[in-house]
């Protein structure tokens, strides 16, 4: 009985620590504040510091000092400190944190959250003409999939090509972007920028290949830019894309998914149609 009660307490403590961590990463500082008292003492100090950082409350420095040494390197605490510094406009001290952390997916816990900070800090560095540092900050994102990964790879390629003037460095980033997206708007963007990259390298064959690829998506901005690169004299031809025969149209409107999209549109809820229309 005593042993199982002791184990139960351990599980309960672990559960509270996990919940506190979840609330902190999600920025839910009210929920976090409510459960801090149920945490073991060391973790109370850690999550009090995180709660103050997230809510931008008073006594930040004092709260961080009180965090026990063994928890000072907690990735969540580092992330909250980074975000706090970035919001205060302290780019240099934000860089100290980014240079100090283990840049692995395992350590970062939520590399997608870190990416948002990297992206904002990267743009600040571009504005200050610190192009090499901006590239390092943006490209060391430690992600391998998802929309944030695609965004990070595109931005890394863009900095490499447009600011560092290193098309060979940009090439892989734009390929990573292209092969991780699905929508025409993104596929055309990836193809166009690969076309530009190969153009800068002086590889006409690959440049044309990617511009042609981009020009398949004429209803998008980058599709039209690609078209202008390979067929500057030809006007846009969307006619072939616009023709639908009557039989196909009738069958199309009988499909269940089409009816759902139609209904969502009618209810002004078309933000939910994106996933169906992919």
Name the predicted role of every residue range.
Residues 21-25, 37-44, 54, 86, ...:
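TPR/TPR-like (Sel1-like) alpha-helical repeat modules
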Residues 1-11:
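Single conserved hydrophobic/aromatic residue that forms the stacking wall/gate
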Residues 23, 85, 125, 160-161, ...:
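Residue at a conserved register position within TPR or TPR-like alpha-solenoid repeats
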Residues 8-9, 23-25, 33-43, 64-74, ...:
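Solenoid-like repeat scaffolds
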Residues 26, 88, 128, 163-164, ...:
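Structural motif corresponding to the intra-repeat A-B loop/turn of tetratricopeptide repeats
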